[in-house]
Amino acid sequence: MMKIEQVLWDWNGTLLDDLEYSIQVRNAIFPAFHLPLLESVEEYHRQFTFPVRLYYQRAGVTDEIFDDVAHAWMAEYERCMDTIPLHEDAVKTVERFRRAGLGQTVLSASEQTLLRRQLALYGLEGRFDAILGRGDIYAGSKEAIGREYLQGSGVPAEAAVMIGDSLHDAEVARALGTRCILVARGHQSRETLLEAGVPVVDSLRKAADWVLEQKEMDG
């Protein structure tokens, strides 16, 4: 197998620890739409999926109010987003990969401008080869963005690894032909992530250990 050269990072839930914050945002806006509040992380994990439109459907959002809910969610999310922490070891892991000579790219379903603003909040925007988000706020698939990037970068898919926190990350990795490891600290539970058939770990440190072990084995 080709030696790992490039890490494709998911952002929300993987480097950014915004699970609890996302629940707070939902509970802040849903009453205005006469929708029920979330009562636990477990309930959120049961409902969350990609594309986000399907997640909203599971939460009771109809097509008629989808746009209104999406815009209200985004406005509330941005209001205090500077209070969201990074996951433990996020910066250390990015730096660890840099020292190991790996290229790193953020590949996110977040809207591009928002994504860049968030990375700037943590002083991370200069640590990645590319910052790739979507052109809208609806958090759809990021497969096409990732495919275009790999084709343009010259990095073979077999030399890249996706690190994420959702089944969608594993689906994107499979479609692109990259390796994948999932971290069960974000928007989907460990039980759900195990359905992907890829390694699942409980911390970024363990994810980094796995990536670097794979890199050495391939070398």
Set out the residue ranges of the language-model regions.
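A short, structured active-site edge motif that brings together acidic residues
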Residues: E42-Y44, E125-G140
